[in-house]
């Protein structure tokens, strides 16, 4: 089930926000409500090469993503940007669910980015085509991975305030480098496939035991 919204002139999703909140309020205390709201903010921020190339330091990082000149943005500024945007968009809906539900509420951390540029350019989603991915190219993979890590940090801060548990990507789906393994790529620039989804369902099943 997904929130109904318009995209590229078509309605996607099948349930209104009000209907989803009612369904959440009807759950029993022994149920489990799992949110996969949003998730692509890190891709919107970092996938398409920005006209002004930028980078930032993670706290445990001693080098930039590459050696070319880049506009350096303070980590705290990047983190605040993610927290502010998530809080006012995706996490606003998540908070509504938390307030409506009597049961435990969890939120799925989105899968990490794909490292393979060739795969990404085969079938990028309309958002990225409209933002010029075919003309401007793709950002450095390490920058994209760092943007995902910042989104995770932002979600950790927000969900802790809400009392929502975060569910990490299944361990077997992630490379040692931190990127999504290629066998779990969906046929687009950003999403994971059904095999990945099955492993997530296994995680949720284990939580209910």
Model-derived features: where do they sit?
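A short beta-strand-loop structural module common to alpha/beta enzyme folds
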Residues: 1-15
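A basic- and aromatic-enriched beta-loop-alpha substructure that forms the phosphate/nucleotide-
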Residues: 13-86
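Short amphipathic alpha-helices and their capping/turn segments at secondary-structure boundaries
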Residues: 16-33, 89-105, 156-157
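Short catalytic/ligand-binding loop motif for oxyanion handling, primarily in non-cytosolic enzymes
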Residues: 41-46, 113-121, 174-178
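Catalytic phosphate/metal-binding cores of nucleic-acid and nucleotide-processing enzymes, i.e., regions
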Residues: 85-92, 172-176, 180-182, 197
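Acidic carboxylate-rich catalytic motifs and surrounding loops in phosphoryl-/glycosyl-chemistry enzymes
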Residues: 109-111, 161-182
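Substrate-gating cap/lid alpha-helix
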Residues: 117-168
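Histidine-centered active-site loop/cap adjacent to the catalytic His
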Residues: 183-209
């Amino acid at each position: 089930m997904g929130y109904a919204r318009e995209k590229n002139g078509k309605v996607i999703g099948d349930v209104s926000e009000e209907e989803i909140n009612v369904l959440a309020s009807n759950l029993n205390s022994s149920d489990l409500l799992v949110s996969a709201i949003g998730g692509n903010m890190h891709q919107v921020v970092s996938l398409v090469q920005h006209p002004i190339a930028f980078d930032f330091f993670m706290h445990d990082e001693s080098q930039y993503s590459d050696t070319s000149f880049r506009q350096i943005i303070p980590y705290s500024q990047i983190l605040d940007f993610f927290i502010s945007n998530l809080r006012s968009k995706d996490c606003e809906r998540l908070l509504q669910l938390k307030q409506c539900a009597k049961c435990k509420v969890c939120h799925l951390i989105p899968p990490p980015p794909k490292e393979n540029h060739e795969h990404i350019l085969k079938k990028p989603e309309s958002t990225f085509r409209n933002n010029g991915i075919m003309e401007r190219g793709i950002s450095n993979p390490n920058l994209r991975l760092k943007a995902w890590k910042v989104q995770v940090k932002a979600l950790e801060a927000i969900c802790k305030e809400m009392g929502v548990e975060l569910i990490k990507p299944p361990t077997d789906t992630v490379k040692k480098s931190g990127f999504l393994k290629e066998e779990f790529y969906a046929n687009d620039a950003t999403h994971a496939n059904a095999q990945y989804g099955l492993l997530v369902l296994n995680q949720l099943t284990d939580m209910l035991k």
